[in-house]
Amino acid sequence: HQHTTEMGLFIHSPQLAAQVLGYTLSAPAQYGITAAPQRFAWLNHGPYAVLLHATSAERKLWAEARWIELGKTLAAQGIRCVLPWGTAAEHERSTRLLQHIPQAVVPERLELSALAALLAQARVVVGTDTGLTHLAGALGVPTIGIYCATDPAATGLHACARGVNLGGIGAPPAVGEVVAAVGKLMMSNEL
C-alpha cells in the first residue's frame, strides 16, 4: 500500500516536508534573497503598499471594487498605494484603480530587479496568487496573499515568516479580512 504526494506540495509547505522527513523546523525559511535598494523618483517619501492586482488567469483576479476599497482604506491611513503592471491589460486595470484610490501611483513598466526593490522597500504587499506575491514573501516583506480560484494550502505563502493567506477556491476574501490582516502585519512589523 503506497501513499503518493505531489512534489509541489513539499515545495510550498516546508513544514509538511520536514514532518515527512522526520525533523522539526525551528524557524521560518530564510531564502537569502535580497534586492538592491533603489530610489524611485516618482514615489515620494513615506510608507507605501504595493497592490499586486494582476495575475495570469482572470479567474484568480480579486474584484476591482475590492482593490479600490482596500486602497482607499490604506490611503486614509497615510499609506500610498503603488499599482505595478506588466501587460497592456494590467496597465489599463492599474489606471482604472488609480482613478479611485487617492494618492495612488502607477509606475512605468518596471524590470524584475526594480520590481524586487519596490517590493522589498514596501511597508506591506497585498497580491493575488502570482509569482510577485511569492517574491515579496521571500524577500521578507509583510505580505498578504489573496486567493480567489486556487487553494492556498497548495500554493499559498507558507514558507515566509510574515505572510498571510486569505480566501480560497471560489471564496475570495472580503475587504474587511484583508484590511484586518494588513493592520496586524504592519503592527507586528513595528514591534
Where are these regions (language model features)?
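Catalytic machinery of carbohydrate-active enzymes
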Residues: 1-191
